[in-house]
């Protein structure tokens, strides 16, 4: 395994860190997964999906519908697994909070081939 991290946002309300974890399984490329860690620095509590949705002012169904529309426009025929954007908590569990947005990260292969990379869909914070 290898790993790296990037501080996405360090504000008074949220500290967000993006972790990238890779494993070489002997294939053509490593398997990489993103993990979003979003913490309220005042309480130490890690934010959950419900918290992210509150920050956007949207429901999971609304986020999923807009995500699918953006993915169709961006990926076209490379959108091979649209069900990866269905309104299920497991599809939107990886997210990163910034000062102005909540960005949901869809893992490699979740909606598109590895060559298309991880997909990120951002929504303004309300």
Residue map of PLM features:
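Compositionally biased intrinsically disordered regions enriched in Thr/Gly
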Residues: 1-126
């Amino acid at each position: 395994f290898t790993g790296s991290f990037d501080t996405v946002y360090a504000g008074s309300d949220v500290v967000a860190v993006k972790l990238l974890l890779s494993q070489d399984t002997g294939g053509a490329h490593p398997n990489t997964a993103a993990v979003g860690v979003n913490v309220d620095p005042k309480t130490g509590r890690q934010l959950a999906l419900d918290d992210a949705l509150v920050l956007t002012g949207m429901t999971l169904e609304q986020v999923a519908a807009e995500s699918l529309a953006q993915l169709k426009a961006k990926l076209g025929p490379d959108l091979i697994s649209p069900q990866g954007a269905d309104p299920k908590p497991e599809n939107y569990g990886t997210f990163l909070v910034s000062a102005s947005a909540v960005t949901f990260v869809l893992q490699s292969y979740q909606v598109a081939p590895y060559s298309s990379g991880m997909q990120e869909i951002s929504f303004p914070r309300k």
